[in-house]
Amino acid sequence: MLAMSSTQIAAFTPDQAAKLTTSQIAALNKQQLQALKPEALAQMSTTQIASLSATQVANLKMEQADALTEPQVLALGNKVVNLYVSPLILDLNRDGKFSVSVDNGVKFDIKSSGSLLKTAWVNSTDGLLVRDLNGNGLIDSGSELFGDHTKLPNGKLAVNGFAALSSLDGNRDGIINSKDTQWKDLKIWIDRNSDGHTDPGELASLADMGVTSLKLNVKSSTAVENGNKIGLVSSYTMVDGSTGVLADVWFRTKSVNAPEVKTVGTLDHITHTDLPPGS
């Protein structure tokens, strides 16, 4: 542990924080890390930021995470899942695009905390895979999406959208379809006006949309789209036998009052040729 108190670390200027070694950063405990000013974190190099452990990233306060630049976020690699939320999205128009940036997104209780967050969001022509758990005709929070805030039968939260969906695979055949008991409960939410609210006509059953199955065999993706990561991809099948991409998209989130952060990075388009074998 760095031999300094949290009070001393809180007094660091951005220039002083930029001089910390990677070993010193890796040694910061939770209290020390959270004492760093957001502007001090933002001044660190991508090498310094990459030295943070997954646990340290998870311990960042919201205002600290908000201050990270896009190059810093990308430098975190797979540890960024601790800064993101991961709903499943069906690429309904099959254009290889899924989402808009957090600054062009919505306010939604995506972490099921009872509080709204600014979050990246699904494109208006694609669909979120959802369940109306409380039967009110609305999708109220991240608990009704399929992602890392989906509660599993054992009471724990899923690690990603496909892990959440896998819990419904009653016959363990790697496919979610009409043979699975909860198939009838699955719906697609197309937020056509991109407002984060479930408006009349935006919720439809999989059958109404012509979807006959969802495959659980996934492969990892390194694509970045509007500051969001396309983490895992699989496929869905339509009644005519055609297929589309089902993706676990890791949305960037920010506190409601956070300033706009410009995003960088390009999307390596996900196409039908990117699907796992057997899709």
Walk through the language-model features, giving the residues of each:
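Calcium-binding acidic motifs and repeat modules
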Residues: V80-S279
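General marker for long, soluble alpha-helical cores
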Residues: M1-P87, G105, D109-K118, A158, ...
